[in-house]
């Protein structure tokens, strides 16, 4: 059975792992002539820890998200893709990717970077890719 992915979603956060996933998503979008949806989730949970610095932190996170998405979109366009959209959301990346963004863009495939969490970090933070695999209804590719 042959699968044709119409919309490929790639979450990016500026990390090396997400940039590798972006490269793979671009390759796949070119191969399948797919729409590429590039998403960034601003994790607002971290602002509650520093109420005095909430506004500057939110502004920095917003600016950083805009920069990350612009660079990723430019990379995709430089590679020859013409159907590229960017999505910026606030919330928990662990739930937003699979439960909100993927259904909104009607993603057939999510391409994500593997995280480098150790056992202790994973217990406290959890893995975004692991949560996305658990909650997604479409295919997922984890890139190492």
Give the positions of each predicted feature.
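Short beta->alpha linker loops
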Residues: 42, 88-92, 115
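General small-molecule cofactor/ligand-binding pocket signal
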Residues: 39, 85-89, 141
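Generic structural signal for helix capping and beta-alpha/helix-loop junctions
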Residues: 45-46, 93, 119
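A short acidic, glycine-rich active-site loop
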Residues: 55-67
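Short, well-ordered secondary-structure micro-motifs
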Residues: 21, 48-51, 96-99, 122-124
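Structural beta-alpha unit
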Residues: 1-3, 74-110
């Amino acid at each position: 059975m042959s699968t044709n992915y119409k919309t490929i979603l790639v979450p990016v956060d500026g990390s090396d792992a997400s940039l590798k996933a972006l490269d793979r998503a671009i390759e796949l979008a070119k191969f399948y002539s797919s729409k590429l949806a590039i998403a960034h989730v601003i994790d607002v949970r971290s602002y509650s820890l520093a109420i005095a610095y909430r506004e500057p932190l939110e502004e920095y996170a917003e600016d950083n998200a805009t920069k990350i998405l612009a660079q990723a979109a430019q990379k995709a366009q430089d590679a020859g893709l013409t159907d590229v959209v960017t999505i910026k959301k606030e919330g928990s990346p662990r739930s937003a990717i699979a439960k909100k963004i993927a259904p909104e863009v009607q993603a057939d495939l999510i391409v994500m970077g593997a995280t480098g969490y150790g056992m202790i970090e994973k217990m406290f933070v959890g893995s975004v890719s692991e949560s996305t695999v658990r909650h997604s209804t479409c295919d997922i590719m984890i890139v190492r």
